[in-house]
């Protein structure tokens, strides 16, 4: 692993932005284009791993709720969904998620086909982000998303200016994560309820345009020897911080 040396060292801690982590060469991933209304396949098998996951065909009298999918009831449900959504149609799952989505958004700059986008999208689904925004190139590495993007509202923006205009029109604060002078400390920051986290490319971090368009930036404290953390990891930390401050967490 080769970290980029972008982090800033302070006497007591490292405060960093997501940075570069390279591993051994991997096969070229398949890239897909994203649009504001990306079509969803009705059935989402896992992209890899054991075939026998999930549940088999429904046993006994069939349920009659409109949320159930006849093909899944007959053939079994092998999708990557929580148990409460077994045998539900994709449309029913999305509708149920839409009724209770959280008020944060996630945006990723995609100028170089960033490998972290899939991981960030998967975390956005787990924490129930309202929308995911891809800025720059439309095509992105879907592998890490584990088909969770099918249950998200994924929007594309040509540049950060259009992203900022869209968010500000909805009253959403745009916050970038980067190690910049004046950045808020995530650990002590009173996070807005309606906020979008913007993540830059691995290595260079936020683009100059993004830094100018953001309403502010925040950084994540580090205390070990590495100068950087992976962008996908940083995104998960930011989203979970929102959950801790604003979500209705079961006791």
Residue ranges and their predicted role:
Residues 2-251:
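Post-transcriptional modification and biogenesis factors for structured RNAs
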């Amino acid at each position: 692993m080769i970290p980029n040396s972008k982090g800033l060292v302070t006497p007591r801690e490292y405060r960093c932005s997501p940075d570069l982590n390279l591993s051994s060469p991997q096969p070229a991933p398949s890239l897909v284009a994203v649009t504001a209304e990306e079509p969803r396949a009705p059935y989402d098998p896992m992209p890899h791993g054991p075939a026998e996951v999930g549940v088999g065909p429904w046993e006994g009298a069939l349920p009659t709720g409109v949320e159930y999918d006849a093909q899944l009831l007959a053939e079994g449900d092998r999708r990557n969904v929580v148990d409460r959504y077994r045998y539900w149609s994709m449309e029913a799952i999305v509708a149920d998620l839409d009724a209770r989505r959280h008020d944060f958004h996630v945006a990723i700059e995609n100028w170089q086909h960033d490998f972290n986008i899939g991981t960030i999208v998967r975390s956005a689904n787990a924490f129930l982000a309202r929308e995911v925004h891809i800025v720059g190139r439309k095509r992105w590495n879907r592998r890490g998303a584990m088909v969770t993007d099918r249950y998200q509202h994924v929007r594309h923006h040509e540049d950060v200016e259009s992203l900022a205009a869209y968010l500000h029109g909805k009253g959403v604060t745009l916050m970038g994560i980067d190690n910049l002078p004046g950045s808020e400390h995530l650990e002590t920051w009173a996070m807005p309820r309606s906020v979008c986290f913007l993540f830059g490319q691995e290595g260079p971090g936020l683009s100059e345009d993004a830094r100018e368009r953001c309403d502010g930036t925040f950084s994540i404290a580090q205390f070990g020897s590495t100068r950087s953390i992976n962008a996908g990891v940083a995104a998960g930390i930011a989203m979970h911080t929102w959950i801790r401050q604003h979500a209705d967490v079961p006791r």
